[in-house]
């Protein structure tokens, strides 16, 4: 469903519709399909009103209905989009969103938007999970009991992981998009005007390399390794910004040196075309000599788990 269609669906919802969606979302932590009787009971409204709301939500493509031993309902991913947009709007984090995407990838879709201050924002919808935290023991255990939540949970975890990395690197002075808000599987950040590094002019190569290495160093000192750094993830405008952080890994991970080396190798390959070298040893020594902040590997996971339970 396009954002235009999502916004139209959202504008058609009333308070009861939103209440039913939130009830179904909360109930999904324990079961895939929620029986009709439970929805009516939890909604606290007469059966006719709840039934009409469910039919409306089904017609809008926000829920799926099954009929078998019992009549039940589950949310679609479109509903999570709507709920995230609703929460961001009601909390004053997002005013508007573009009808067409400005970036489409395998793991996410990005739209431009506007926050209440009038500042242009990038609104990133995570669609699949790329976070290394998905492989954490607690995450695997959570999903093993809730297979129906896998796609949503992984997208949500990736969004929160990216927001955590952006916050740490931005606060440390690194050149990344300023994080504004995260809700469910959606991250709102300040929009960066620029082009990816593959399109820079030769005279911009050296300042670009310096900015990127500086940001990599800030991230390392905060215990973070990008994990997928390449010219595709560098936006060059007034400065060079490193974007796309959901797959970051802690510097304390057993494979941290290997992951950092891969990032540096891709930078070396690109900047060698401009006769620019990267001081690989200095960056790796930050890990080897433990000159970084220790990150609790499960902290991001725990926040996402709590958000599921409290939804």
Model-predicted segments: where are they?
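Short alpha-helical segments that sit at the start of domains
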Residues: 1-22, 49
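Conserved ATP-binding subdomain of kinase catalytic cores across diverse folds
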Residues: 4-9, 48-51, 60, 64-66, ...
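Conserved kinase catalytic-core helix
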Residues: 33-47, 150-176, 197-232, 264, ...
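Basic amphipathic alpha-helical segments that dock to polyanions
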Residues: 39, 50-61, 219
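Minor-groove-contacting beta-hairpin "wing" of winged helix-turn-helix DNA-binding domains
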Residues: 70-76
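Active-site acidic catalytic loop and adjacent metal/ATP-binding pocket
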Residues: 104, 108-115, 119-122, 211-247
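C-lobe/activation-segment region of protein kinase-like
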Residues: 220-226, 238-311
């Amino acid at each position: 469903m396009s954002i235009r269609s999502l916004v139209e669906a959202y504008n058609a919802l009333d308070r009861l519709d939103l209440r039913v969606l939130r009830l179904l979302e909360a109930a999904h932590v324990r079961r895939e399909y929620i029986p009709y009787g439970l929805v009516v009971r939890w909604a606290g409204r007469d059966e006719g009103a709840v039934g009409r709301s469910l039919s409306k939500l089904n017609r809008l493509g926000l829920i799926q209905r099954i009929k078998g031993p019992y009549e039940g309902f589950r949310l679609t991913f479109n509903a999570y989009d709507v709920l995230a947009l609703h929460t961001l709007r009601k909390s004053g984090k997002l005013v508007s969103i573009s009808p067409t995407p400005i970036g489409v990838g395998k793991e996410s879709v990005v739209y431009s938007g506007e926050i209440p201050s009038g500042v242009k924002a990038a609104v990133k919808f995570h669609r699949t999970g790329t976070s290394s935290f998905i492989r954490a023991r607690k995450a695997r255990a959570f999903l093993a009991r809730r297979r129906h939540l896998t796609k949503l949970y992984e997208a949500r975890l990736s969004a929160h992981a990216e927001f955590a990395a952006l916050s740490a690197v931005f606060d440390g002075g690194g050149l990344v998009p300023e994080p504004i808000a995260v809700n469910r599987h959606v991250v709102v950040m300040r929009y960066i005007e620029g082009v990816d590094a593959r399109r820079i002019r030769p005279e911009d190569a050296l300042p670009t390399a310096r900015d990127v290495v500086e940001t990599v160093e800030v991230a390392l000192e905060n215990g973070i390794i990008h994990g997928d750094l390449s010219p595709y993830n560098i936006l060059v405008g007034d400065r060079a910004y490193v974007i796309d952080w959901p797959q970051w890994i802690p510097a304390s991970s057993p494979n941290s040196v290997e992951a950092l080396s891969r990032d540096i190798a891709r930078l070396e390959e690109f900047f060698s075309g401009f006769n620019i070298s990267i001081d690989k040893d200095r960056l790796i020594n930050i890990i080897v000599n433990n000159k970084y902040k220790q990150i609790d590997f499960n902290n991001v996971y725990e926040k996402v788990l709590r958000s599921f339970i409290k939804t």
